[in-house]
A protein has these predicted regions:
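Phosphate/pyrophosphate-binding catalytic cores of soluble transferases and nucleic-acid-acting enzymes
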Residues: 1-312
């Protein structure tokens, strides 16, 4: 936790695995401490995907001011650096109003950018980046990943072969700066060093989380508006490498539309993907959020009291 002396510059971070109840708790907290919520989920930034990405409900948006939700087009990339810049501006404006910024989400890289800062990697031209992408497209992701690990062994076990965006970024950084992306990451500092940053992680037991995931998946997929928004998204036919394609459920619903799986299989496959994602989030938190306060209680009222105690 940050120093308690900077009460007028307090920022609260709330993270946890998907479906752990972050959004609901953050709204309760914001109402209690006069706060405003800032999105820290990389899939909830998109305008076109609201229901499938579990963006806050309209009722919650009316209760508390929310920032950085549904503002970005799925047709373009949006980097961690761009997000951080917007967050800093948002946080400053919220504090100026005498309120408390509450960052809520499950994207580990977003929170790492807030707590540790971003590396100052020299700009790499679009021509060079496109040249790297051509190599990737030509040889495929498996061979390209081997090429990355060969040139930059520090990436092994840190970047998944299937994470196209990060694989390409790591490769181009190593090739054109002669330094690993992880060497650059060593020389970073947080833009929020002068703030009182409180870090809360919702540490929900796995068996309870799986029930929550299952319930949420059924509810989302039963909503015809969800299927309609995915249909509209697919009609945009965006470039495959764009991050929005990785929103859980897109591929599965597409397969359902094409008659390649039943509705029952759709629910099960989305559940599997969501459980896998939750596991990755938990693994990330154990490695990168070691100084975060982990809270949990079976009773939501007790959980809220624990969080309130940590941020007061």
């Amino acid at each position: 936790m940050g120093s308690k002396s900077n009460n007028n510059k307090k920022i609260i971070l709330i993270s946890g695995p998907t479906a752990s109840g972050k959004s609901k708790l953050s709204v309760l907290l914001a109402k209690k401490i006069n706060g405003e919520i800032i999105n820290a989920d990389s899939m909830q930034i998109y305008k076109e995907i609201s229901i499938l990405s579990s963006r806050p409900k309209i009722t919650d948006l009316k209760k508390v001011k929310h920032h950085l939700y549904g503002f970005q087009s799925v047709n373009s990339k949006f980097s961690v650096g761009q997000w951080l810049k917007k967050v800093k501006k948002c946080a400053i404006n919220i504090i100026k109003k005498g309120k408390v910024p509450i960052l809520v989400g499950g994207t580990g890289l977003y929170f790492k950018a807030v707590t540790s800062g971003l590396s100052r990697i020299p700009k790499i031209s679009n021509n060079k980046r496109e040249a790297v992408k051509k190599i990737y497209d030509k040889i495929g992701y498996k061979k390209f990943y081997k090429k990355l690990i060969s040139s930059d062994p520090l990436c092994k076990n840190k970047i998944l072969a299937s994470d196209t965006q990060r694989v390409l970024r790591a490769f181009e950084v190593k090739r054109f700066t002669k330094k690993s992306i992880y060497e650059w990451a060593k020389n970073t500092k947080s833009d929020f060093k002068e703030y009182d940053v409180r870090k809360i992680y919702l540490n929900i037991p796995r068996e309870k989380l799986l029930i929550k995931i299952n319930d949420r998946t059924k509810k989302i997929l039963a909503d015809q508006k969800c299927l309609k928004e995915v249909k509209n998204f697919l009609n945009l036919n965006i470039i495959k490498s764009l991050p929005a394609n990785k929103i859980i459920g897109i591929t599965e619903i597409k397969s359902f539309f094409e008659g390649r799986q039943t509705y029952k299989q759709l629910i099960e496959n989305v559940n599997i993907k969501t459980r896998q994602y939750a596991k990755r989030q938990s693994t990330w938190s154990r490695g990168h959020m070691t100084d975060w306060v982990r809270v949990y209680s079976d009773k939501s009222s007790n959980l809220f009291k624990k969080i309130l105690k940590e941020v007061s």
